[in-house]
Amino acid sequence: MTTFAPSETLHRLIKHALDSGAAGTLKEAEELFRGYRIAFVIGEDQARQPLEQATLLSAVAMASRVFLGGVFVEGSLDVPLCVGGAPGGTLADAIAELGGELSGSALGRSTIIIGGPPMPRREGFCVRTICAGWRGGIAPGHSAVVPTAGPEMPLTAMLSAALAVNEAFLYVSGGTPAAGYRVVGLSLWEPAATTDWLTETGGEPQLTYLPSQLWLLGLGHLGQAYLWGLGLLPYADPASLSLVLQDVDVVTPSTLSTSILSDRTMLGKKKTRAMAAWAEQRGFTTTICERLFDASVRRQIGEPAMGICGLDNALGRLALDKAGFEFVVEAGLGRGHRDFRTMRIHTLPNGRETSNLWNADSATEAVQEGPAYEAMLKNGELDKCGVTLLAGKAVGAPFVGAVAASLTLSEILRLLHGAPVNQLIDLDLQCVEHRSIVKNSCDFSSLNPGFVLV
């Protein structure tokens, strides 16, 4: 039986309550989260649609790691499952596997409605997910907002689900008084803040090309969100996607709180092997690499030319331009209780060396002298070393990684469909409308990193 250190067992979003002062002790923080509940409602027509099924299952998989008091689903759920990679034979089976409970009524609970038309106003928190073309977002459940149609793009399911769960957590945790009362969304085809994400401008393409080879660096919070997103894409033959999966860590109880594909059966197992098993069950082809990614790693002929980076350390990122990749998309997330909803996405090459993009030493919030950590030390729960290790762990939430993964994978899809890629996407889920985008000036028109047709 594997024994885990306290720093490996702490729920990464419960840590937000400790670091922010919302809870004075770990017990108080855990009780607070056990009081968080969320309900999902899906209509009979929506329950049979692949995009709405993907939205619901993505949302349940995230919410079950956040709303520890229960995730409840109302709707006609005994329908055939039509989402690749999801567990079970029916929608109800998949919901149960992902941590949801089948419920006759969502009344009295904070509610997320999956797609469909505007609904009558409800008491309390209620938002509706929106997917149209390459655009995804949320609106108040009763809002008359209806987007113009466009060619379906499955990653909008993950995007809208993540935005909805983020909004619900903002509401229950008191993160912003506007939670649930605003329209929030973006376009994965043109993510600039100036884009009207509710309107299709004619530029969105039919999804035609998918990557055939990818190298995933890091298989934690971000890496598993990448895999979930890849699992939603419509591969005619899933075996046509070849993945190199690189990581050195094992799945810990902390992993379960942020990483969308991890479950208790994986505890103590290498992330590479657990994720390879999931990917192969989805039908993908995998190769695993269980060594640190650093400046000594070199891509060999025949290995994926495109890298997707989800590493949480600057030293690994500094080596991204030395490994021989022809194209890299990298995402980094905030670590502290104030900035954990922030993300910054880079594409490489972009005319700058990685040494000019990141510092080897990254600043962290000093929280180990907070009341919750002082209580642990005073009560003898942990010694000074244990408190320091625990306080140094990042705050994290699965909905943050899911939004970042939607944007990261979309950069690859945009490249394959001939669009200019973005050098930088800077976004905070507290205020999505204030995101900033910088276009990549490099010419990728002659790059062929490998693709297959939908």
Language-model segments: residues:
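Conserved SAM/SAH-binding loop
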Residues: 290-298
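Glycine- and acidic-residue-enriched helix-capping/strand-helix junction motifs
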Residues: 50-54, 260-269
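Helix N-cap at the beta1-alpha1 junction of Rossmann-like dinucleotide-binding domains, i.e.
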Residues: 78, 250-252
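Short acidic, glycine/proline-rich loop/turn micro-motifs
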Residues: 141, 254-260
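Glycine-rich phosphate/adenylate-binding loop
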Residues: 1-240, 299-454
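A conserved beta-strand->alpha-helix junction
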Residues: 282-291
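Conserved beta-strand positions in the Rossmann-like core of class I SAM-dependent methyltransferases
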Residues: 243-244
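N-terminal glycine-rich dinucleotide-binding loop that anchors FAD/FMN and/or NAD(P) in oxidoreductases
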Residues: 86-97, 263-282
